[in-house]
Amino acid sequence: YLALARQLVVAGWLLPFPLAIFLLLAFGGVDPSLWGGFHLNILLALVAIVASFPLGVLLALGRTSSFPVLRVASTAYIELIRGVPLITILLMAWLVLPDFLPSFAGLDDMELVYRVMVAFTLFTAAYVAEAVRGGLQAVPRGQVEAAQALGLGTVAILGFIVLPQALRAVIPALVG
């Protein structure tokens, strides 16, 4: 039974390749002029992921902070952004923000790309913050107490004890 299952899996992976080659040769590939959107999409995703990670970590730290103003502001931002659909944020970046921001001469298309980068970054940061907050809560309180007993300060405890363990715990959630 397992041998047949393995053969079916191998066949399922190998049979689409000749079919794909036939389709590409018979009907032609994608016109290179249509690849511009793909590159822009990859650029937007990379910028959003890289820029949202530090912002998300700061928001998660703010949400778990003992300072009420910081905690409330972080919580309000995260809940507001997570409660609004991404398409709404993108439409606001496209249609509403130009009315409030000064226009730079001749950079309208690039301005739109920058606005979308910021919108994706702010949206992704809220979700990263929630994942990191879960990781921060997963670190046992005894770790912090042990670090305090050793005389470490708050920044050292966060940087050397809490954040490495929290980020290690949330890698699957961030990647998936």
Where do the PLM segments sit?
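Transmembrane alpha-helices and adjacent helix-loop boundaries
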Residues: Y1-G176
